[in-house]
Amino acid sequence: MSRSLSRRRFLAALGVSGAFLARETRGWAEAAPTTAAAGAAPRRFIGVYTPHGRAHELWQPRDGFDIAYEGSVLAPLDDAARFGQSFRERLLVLDGIDLSAGIEVGTTGHDGSRVILTGSGADGKNASLDQFLAVEHGIGAETPHTSLVLGVGSDSTEVGLNLSWARGGTPLPKWIDPARVYAELFGTPLGARQGELEPARRAGKSVLDRVRGDLARLTRRAPHSERTKLEQHATALRDIEKRLSHTAPTCASPAPPPAFERLKSFGGGEPFFDAITDLQIDLLARAISCDLTRVATLYLADLTRSKMFAELPEDVHQEVAHRYDAHDDVHRGTPDSWAKLAIQNHYTYGKLARLLQRLAEAGALDSTLVHASGDMGDPARHSSRQVPTLLVSGRDFGLKTGRYLDLRHGKNLSEGVPNNRLLVSVANLFGAPVTRFGESKNTSLLSGSLDALRG
C-alpha cells in the first residue's frame, strides 16, 4: 500500500465517503484541506427483525408455556434435537406490544420497522436502542466495531427497511454480503498483505489524525443545526481508529464465505437467500463471541417472492400474508390461512434458533440479550399493534424467563402497551438510567418500564 495514501482514498477504503466533510458542511464551512467487571463477561445486545407479521393462533404458547405443540411457529426454539439444546427456558414471549409512536403518525405496516428500536415515527431524531447502547451509553467503546448492522436481501435505507438509526434520524446502511462482513471482521485492513500490515496502519493513522483536525475545526464553526451530523462523523472516525489499532482476533477465524452471484431479494437473489442468511448469522455470532463487537442488528428481508427456499408458498406476500384471516371473539377465522403464514414464521424462528445455537456453542449466550420483533401483528391489516416480540435473555440479566406475558387489555384485548416501555426496560438492563425512550407528541407513550419482565 502506498505511504502517500490520501484522506479520500483512506476513508473510501473503510467505507466512509472521502467527500463527507465538504458535503455535510456545504454552505457554511470552508473546504476541508463500558468496561466489564473483572471475571464477568461484558453484556451484549442483538436486535433481530422478523418479517411479515405472525399467525397469532400458532405463535401464542399454550398452557404450561408449551411452544412445541403441532403447528407452533416457535417450535424451533424448543428443538434440542435440531439446535443442540432447547431455548424455551431463556425465552420471554411478549404479547401485546404496540408500535404506538409510529401509529400516532402513520409510520405503520411495512414502515413499522422504523419504530421497533427507536420508539419513534418516521421523523424521529433519536438513536435506535442498539446505537444508544453502543455509542451514547458506551458499551461499544472497547471493541473494534462499535456495532454491526447486518441484513439479508436488502441494503436499502428506506424508512421501513432499517432497524438501526443514528442520532439525528440517520439510517445506518446494512452489510448484506457475507464476504464483506468476513473481510471487515477477520480480513487484513485496507486489503494489505500481512507484511504490509503495520505500514498500512501507520499510514492510516496519519491520515486519520489530519481528518480529525479538519473535523475539529469545522465543528467549532458549525451552526448548532449541523452539530449532530458532525458528531456522527466523529463517531465513525473513532470506529475507524479502533479498527486500525486492533490486533487480529485471538479466537479462530471461520472459513471465508463464498462469493454469491446475487445478493438482493426481488432482483434474482432469492435462490441464495437461505445460504446467505445462515452465513450472516454465523458471522454475527462469531463477532459477538470474539468480542469484535457487543452490539448488533440483523434485518431479515421481507419474504415475498418464490424460490427463496423450498418449503415456502409461491408468494408469501399477496397469497399468504394478505389472506391471513385471524380468529377473534367475534370471528372464527380461517385455519388454513394460519397454517400458510405459519410456514414463513416457523422458518424465521428457525433462523433465530440458529443464532442462539451459535452463541451458546461459543459460550456467549449467557451474557447476550436478543430482542426479536416484527413490524406487524396482523399482516392482512398491516397492523402495527400486537407485533410479535420475543426476548431471549442470558442468565446474566436476571429476568424471569421461560414464560408468556400477555400485556393486552381493553375491549376484546385489542390494546397493548407502547414498545417504548420495553426499550426503556432493555436500556435499564444495560445500566442506562433512562425513564423514557423515543419521540412522540403524545409524551405519555414514551415513559415507564415493564416491571413484569423480572417476574
Task: Label each region the model flagged.
Residues 2-455:
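Ligand-binding pockets and gating/stacking loops
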